[in-house]
Amino acid sequence: MNLEKFVDELPIPEVAEPVKKNPRQTYYEIAMEEVFLKVHRDLPPTKLWTYNGSLPGPTIKANRNEKVKVKWMNKLPLKHFLPVDHTIHAGHHDEPEVKTVVHLHGGVTPASSDGYPEAWFSRDFEATGPFFEREVYEYPNHQQACTLWYHDHAMALTRLNVYAGLAGFYLISDAFEKSLELPKDEYDIPLMIMDRTFQEDGALFYPSRPNNTPEDSDLPDPSIVPFFCGETILVNGKVWPYLEVEPRKYRFRILNASNTRTYELHLDNDATILQIGSDGGFLPRPVHHQSFSIAPAERFDVIIDFSAYENKTIVLKNSAGCGQDVNPETDANIMQFKVTRPLKGRAAKTLRPIFKPLPPLRPSRADNERTLTLTGTQDKYGRPILLLDNQFWNDPVTENPRLGSVEVWNIVNPTRGTHPIHLHLVQFRVIDRRPFDTDIYQSTGEIVYTGPNEAPPLHEQGYKDTIQAHAGEVIRIIARFVPYSGRYVWHCHILEHEDYDMMRPMDIIQ
């Protein structure tokens, strides 16, 4: 649907208000609710599933080492309004159709509060999954300042629940961040980017079968689809919004919350975007971009300087297609900045943040090394199933790092596409990438490299929890598995892949 662009103002997510707060802890109650919200001036209200009635949900702000507790409450209907495939793993008919569980993405969190897919719960906790342990989640927030996000992670339903609107920001701050000369308060804005398809009545559309499925196909109906690309782009819950800004520097925390789509972002006036942080916090030094690629679940913490563009408009654009070439009338556009607000007070002319260097990588000193391959097969209906190391979700656990150990993971991607790989619990670092011959690999299983090791680009040299594993490459990452033991997961963050079956349990053992 080609709606008029830049007619709705960008909403700024509200900050969550705690129910209780004392020196020992901060306690929130956040409900998942079905609401109807206006996403565009010319559309009727859209049915959405939200946290506390808004998309994005309320932003939780925490200081480092502040203990936060959240009671996530499912107040959703008993029937899903998007097409549920009961044939994929854990889609059992004897379980509630609507299941939820919340994962703090990038959070270093005890296993019982991590949002394990089988720790799901139904409305008012009437039914719970086999790994359910607690109604109130605990977040210690021992991490450095970083931009995290929370979203649904229910088994076999993540793609639908997140598409319905279950996502929000979680920001951790610390004394080091506060010492930097960065834009703050109203000049520090989170941007949640997602793609959707709408019907004429404003309803969300999500396909019930893969494209070009014959009418007489024996595929289940509904059936999971291998990917989803919407032609309409939302930022903070509005379609192609605009933001009025002052001629000064702004900090934007950009999150790709799309199911499948990777964006290649740039400004239409070719202005430089200064990146200061990635998934797990600040980079060792700032990086200047003319454009950058951001895959599902990745975060880019950036500064845009509008001081030279008073009374001008600038459009944040996307040059990456999704299943087809980008359309200049639709998905090539993200949002518009109008530099029309008068400058309030004094704005810093330059930024002089002194960032901390990260410790050197020492892969040779790792306690263990694993080689893990992104693979796939077909189910009995001929549908693709993407896998991690040829293992299904229900197969025995094979990734079992010892608590406190350092491991190197060699992630081999012989598939034809990029997969954003996410590890729970840890913030890892990228060692290098190396291209290999996928044809030889597919025929013999042998990895024959076609080029040298390539150091990660500057923007990937910080702490990451999600990394783009490109086709025809081996990417090496290194992580220390601390500070909690227990059951976690790692998976592809293309949600249609994660739900079937590109996700594996991971046990951190004592």
From Swiss-Prot:
It is an enzyme of class 1 (oxidoreductase). Its EC number is 1.10.3.2. The record marks D114, E498 as: Plays a crucial role in the protonation steps. Resistant to alkali and organic solvents such as methanol, ethanol and acetone. Resistant to EDTA, which might be explained by the spatial protection of copper ions in the active sites. Inhibited by DMSO. Strongly inhibited by Fe(2+) and DTT. Cu cation 3 binds at H153, H424, H491. Residues 45-79, 99-174, 242-317, 372-506 form the Plastocyanin-like domain. Cu cation 1 binds at H103, H422. The keyword Transport does not apply. Optimum pH is 5.0. One of its GO terms (molecular function) is hydroquinone:oxygen oxidoreductase activity. Thermostable. Optimum temperature is 70 degrees Celsius. Its cofactor is Cu(2+). It catalyses: 4 hydroquinone + O2 = 4 benzosemiquinone + 2 H2O. Cu cation 2 binds at H105, H151, H493. Binds 4 copper ions per subunit. The keyword Hydrolase does not apply. Exhibits efficient decolorization ability towards indigo and crystal violet, which are extensively used in textile industries and biochemical study, suggesting a potential application of this laccase in industrial processes. Multicopper oxidase that catalyzes the oxidation of a variety of substrates, including phenolic and non-phenolic compounds. Substrates include 2,6-dimethoxyphenol (2,6-DMP) and the non-phenolic compound 2,2'-azino-bis(3-ethylbenzothiazoline-6-sulfonic acid) (ABTS). Cannot use guaiacol and catechol. Belongs to the multicopper oxidase family. This is Laccase.
